[in-house]
Amino acid sequence: MNENKPGDSQNLACVFCRKNDDCPNKYGEKKTKEKWNLTVHYYCLLMSSGIWQRGKEEEGVYGFLIEDIRKEVNRASKLKCCVCKKNGASIGCVAPRCKRSYHFPCGLQRECIFQFTGNFASFCWNHRPVQIITSNNYRESLPCTICLEFIEPIPSYNILRSPCCKNAWFHRDCLQVQAINAGVFFFRCTICSNSDIFQKEMLRMGIHIPEKDASWELEENAYQELLQHHERCDVRRCRCKEGRDYNAPDSKWEIKRCQCCGSSGTHLACSSLRSWEQNWECLECRGIIYNSGEFQKAKKHVLPNSNNVGITDCLLEESSPKLPRQSPGSQSKDLLRQGSKFRRNVSTLLIELGFQIKKKTKRLYINKANIWTSALDAFRNRNFNPSYAIEVAYVIENDNFGSEHPGSKQEFLSLLMQHLENSSLFEGSLSKNLSLNSQALKENLYYEAGKMLAISLVHGGPSPGFFSKTLFNCLVYGPENTQPILDDVSDFDVAQIIIRINTATTVADLKSVINECYNYLELIGCLRLITTLSDKYMLVKDILVYHVIQRVQAPFESFKQGLKTLGVLEKIQAYPEAFCSILCHKPESLSAKILSDLFTVHTLPDVKALGFWNSYLQAVEDGKSTTTMEDILIFATGCSSIPPAGFKPTPSIECLPVDFPVGNKCNNCLAIPVTNTYKEFQENMDFTIRNTLKLEKEESSHYIGH
């Protein structure tokens, strides 16, 4: 027998590199010829500069004759490795006039390139081939399309780029393992599946592609798993009461798989899909596609002229935005496209926008007592970049000690959105429109408000929920295609004028009202000749358009520009139905089940404490506690509702041997007490949460007062 058993050769060193490592992925197969007392690594033998394959495949070692191997070892013994300074350097750089020699493992250590093709050339670290890109428009990090870990999209020895797909980046180690497993017949670009161009470039950059069948082709029942489809809902919040594994064909609870990888799924209802025919991608695949530039800015849709719609109807109910009328031939095609485009989950859309956030962090110093001014100063700082990750530190104004303490980003964004909703930049009770504030316009505050709102949405802030449908339609479809309603008018006197005009029953009554309001109508340019009673409808329409839209045109344009930060406005215009749910409507009320599902247990659970926790949530929901669901969430996270993009990190529960609960808003962690009785548990929870939130409000009022 010529070859040793695998166990016998483990301690034998390669005659070229003098290492006894047995690592096929790194050094190639380790082979020992017992008869000739010879052990070699395949790559060390293959890349040696002074040896050629003169025999047949079954002769010697891989076709290299034993006598040739001994001659090469003898030649290399006279050459010193420029890395480890030891003799036996059998590999030399092929660059002209370069005299560097090294062992194969030493070359790997110094990031040399070994080309496993042609003449099997090797290049030292100074002369190795490199990948060149003409421009780098990539964000700070992109995922390796094999392992999906984020990497810096800059070509280097360890980071390679696909020659056929601009958005495909790889770790060298991931590519090498992939090549060894796939072999020459199945090694190809992970995005476009190109093999010729891809393999040629990878060989140039030193990836070894063995001439063998794929490893999975050699396994028994290799394709058995392909006979089973992935049937599980993997979205963050599954809505199916039957569970994530429930699959009911031809219903809203049918499982739809990712069209890219097929290894993630969703119920149609959980991702707001109307039918099984609609395309759906999982978050991992969508992140890769998003960064490739596949998501193009959607064109703004125009509302049809509503000349045939009665003005009275506009006063009583909200206008319903519709797409332009199309020819019958294109209508069905576009409806299919719109079904896929507009029926998207808003949390998924915000997570997509969140891919822009870089690893670099910007610390914001925020005074909770003056949240607006400190936020304005932070966002206007020339070093602030909306795409940087936000870190919050709370400070106290006029504090001689200059103390600061870590703050919760989501709490800060929640406080900022609350201030924005109640600020003088908006008017209205619940559904708000932009106001006309000349000083705010002069200070560019409308732009800053739009910018803050965009940043809040992308960085995990709460749902604003206070936009009127009119303001929303102006942003999506344009002011020229939006008809305001009476509820949009917050000025009592103007609203009374509109009501009096609209309720006039005769031409004489109508003219009488117009005469009383003559100066106002002349000032806003809405005077018109009245000949019939129906003229009142056009007059009401003109007044509404002026007061709600034209009067605030300058603030609107400024606010709109701010919303373009991080591409938020473009996303709103592309998916209006999804964003309407968070811009025009308050989030759903919290329940015991929602909070129970929201918090995960990270530490070793205490069964009794967790039972008390679930009972406490139910008691709060039933009104048997002095706290509310919102109080609990604020105590633990700083937010009164679940942000559309979700919490980062995910809220967690810890069972600690303490008497009172502890809320860590920076980590979204709630430590619940371990008590002997449920009564003691509830009393301690109520007391701590109620008094903590009360104290925070009093401190805020105290600072404002000073």
Curated annotation (Swiss-Prot):
Zinc finger (PHD-type): 79-128, 143-193, 237-286
Domain of life: Eukaryota
Gene Ontology terms: biological process: apoptotic process; protein ubiquitination
All copies of domain HECT, residue ranges: 371-698
Involved pathway(s): Protein modification; protein ubiquitination
Location of the protein in the cell: Nucleus, Nucleolus; Cytoplasm
Protein's name according to its UniProt entry: G2/M phase-specific E3 ubiquitin-protein ligase
Domain remarks: Ubiquitin ligase activity is mediated by two distinct domains, PHD-type zinc fingers 2 and 3. The use of these distinct domains may allow ubiquitination of different targets by each domain. The HECT domain is catalytically inactive and does not contribute to this activity.
Keyword tags: Apoptosis, Cytoplasm, Developmental protein, Metal-binding, Nucleus, Repeat, Transferase, Ubl conjugation pathway, Zinc, Zinc-finger
InterPro entries, per database record: EPHD, HECT_dom, Hect_E3_ubiquitin_ligase, PHD-type_Zinc_Finger, PHF7/G2E3_ePHD, PHF7/G2E3_PHD, Zinc_finger_PHD-type_CS, Znf_FYVE_PHD
Function: E3 ubiquitin-protein ligase which accepts ubiquitin from an E2 ubiquitin-conjugating enzyme in the form of a thioester and then directly transfers the ubiquitin to targeted substrates. Essential in early embryonic development to prevent apoptotic death.
The keyword Methyltransferase is annotated on this UniProt entry: no
Gene Ontology molecular function terms on file: ubiquitin-protein transferase activity; zinc ion binding
Catalytic activity field: S-ubiquitinyl-[E2 ubiquitin-conjugating enzyme]-L-cysteine + [acceptor protein]-L-lysine = [E2 ubiquitin-conjugating enzyme]-L-cysteine + N(6)-ubiquitinyl-[acceptor protein]-L-lysine
Entry keyword Zinc-finger: yes
Pfam families in UniProt: HECT, zf-HC5HC2H
Zn finger limits (C2HC pre-PHD-type): 11-51
EC number: 2.3.2.26
Uppermost EC category: transferase
Any Gene Ontology CC annotation: nucleolus
